[in-house]
A protein has these predicted regions:
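Beta-strand/loop substructures that line and gate deep hydrophobic ligand-binding cavities in soluble
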Residues: 2-45, 166-227
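Hydrophobic/aromatic beta-strand elements that line small-molecule binding cavities or substrate pockets
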Residues: 88, 151-159, 184-192
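Short, low-complexity, polar/charged sequence segments that are solvent-exposed and flexible
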Residues: 106-109, 155-158, 190-191, 218-222
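Residue-level detector of alpha-helical recognition elements and their boundaries
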Residues: 113-114, 197, 240
Length: 242
């Protein structure tokens, strides 16, 4: 991130801060003495038990504020964007298998996939595949409240991050609000390297978004994509045997 490495200890510190924040935001009790990993695992179970409707009901006022703030930021930003970019290296999988596993988790609306998508980052309140879209409810960076938006895959209107042909697998899509307002987008690109894979993940925000949000979202990307990649490594048989 910004040509600087971010180690496991720093990621753990970030996760602990943010997982506790989500517990509080959802009005859930937690064990202060539990490890960060335990807190994250229990939070995932609690989110699953609550279900989509109950979670949205708890944070509906925050989502309305998020919607308003994104509309204002988008209108005042025009076509200008800021980018949160994080590069990740991993061993134990190749791009071909990773792509198929990620497609499986992203496009198939199953109970297992919903749980996986909640588990990879404590800031995920909901990630729900809906035909050609992925509904996302998450806290982006250190924003004051969670946001709701929809990623329309394989559409690139307004995406400013160019495709790099050296990365054979990509996830690209526009991010829009419920009313269709385009607020940004994603272009995540992946390739095989000598020892595993290299992932360059990028999210585009309206330019008016504070730098602090964009910078913190780089860590969010590191956490969630490390989680997805590790899950893919552990579940390669999903596609190898199909």
């Amino acid at each position: 991130m910004n040509e600087k490495s971010f180690d496991a200890k720093a990621l753990e510190k970030w996760k602990r801060k943010h997982v506790i924040s989500v517990y509080k935001n959802l009005g859930l009790s937690y064990d202060w003495e539990a490890s960060t990993e335990q807190l994250c695992e229990v939070l995932t179970e609690k989110k699953v038990d609550l279900g989509y409707d109950a979670i949205v009901a708890k944070i509906q006022n925050q989502l309305k504020l998020g919607d308003i703030s994104l509309k204002i930021a988008t209108k005042l930003s025009g076509k200008r964007r800021k980018k949160a970019t994080t590069k990740i290296y991993a061993e134990g999988i190749d791009v071909e298998i990773l792509g198929r596993v990620i497609d499986h988790v992203t496009y198939l609306n199953t109970a297992e996939n919903l749980k996986v998508n909640l588990s990879v980052c404590p800031e995920h309140y909901a990630l729900v595949p809906r035909e050609e879209e992925l509904e996302v409810i998450e806290k982006t960076g250190n924003a004051p409240f969670p946001m709701q938006f929809f990623i329309r895959f394989n559409e690139e209107e307004g995406i400013q991050t160019p495709r790099d042909e050296e990365y054979p697998y990509q996830i690209v899509g526009i991010a829009k609000l419920k009313d269709g307002t385009i607020i940004g987008g994603v272009r995540h690109q992946f390739r095989n390297v000598e020892q595993g894979i290299e992932a360059v993940t990028c999210v585009e925000f309206p330019a008016l978004c504070p730098n602090s949000i964009v910078k913190d979202h780089q860590i969010h990307l590191a956490v969630e994509w490390s989680g997805w990649i590790q899950w893919a490594i552990d579940h390669q048989d999903l596609v190898q045997n199909s």
